Amino acid sequence: MIENINYTRIEKAIQYLVENFKQQPTLDELAQYIGISPFHFQRIFTEWAGVSPKKFLEHLTIEALKQELQDTSNLIEAAEKVGLSAQSRVYDLFVKIEAVTPQEYKSKGAGIRFEYGFSATPFGECFIVSTSRGVCEMQFSDC
């Protein structure tokens, strides 16, 4: 029974995050929306989604930012459209999640050295791509 309640809570939280990521809701705001303590919310969200609410929000934000950068060359304008107030947050988010700077992303990786390889994992074969800053792509294959 608790499992069904938690599924519903996390489904509601994910929907809320998708619809409101531009406001960059805090852990406290999310927990209040769901109706449980921030500690409990953090624990069950991470258990069900596989990442923390903060990481989930960062990934929603970076995907929206990448989409905005397709339409504009102005990084500040793109950042504002996705709810980020500072250009430094955009830079940090790109490097942390994509392992490239916003400018490198915008130039489609021109001049960056990418290394790649394959590895067997418990989840199947994994294709990994990295830059000097870290892993920038992972894909699993069932072939």
Label every PLM stretch briefly.
Residues 14, 18, 32, 50, ...:
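Residues within alpha-helical segments
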Residues 15, 70-71, 75-143:
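Low-complexity, small/basic-enriched stretches
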Residues 4-6, 57-66, 104-114:
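Short, basic, alpha-helical segments at the C-terminal edge of helix-turn-helix-like DNA-binding modules
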Residues 1-2, 24-57, 81-97:
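Basic/polar phosphate-binding segments, predominantly the helix-turn-helix DNA-binding elements
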Residues 1-11:
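Short, charge-enriched, intrinsically disordered boundary segments that mark the beginning
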Residues 12-25, 45, 66-74:
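Basic, amphipathic alpha-helical hairpins
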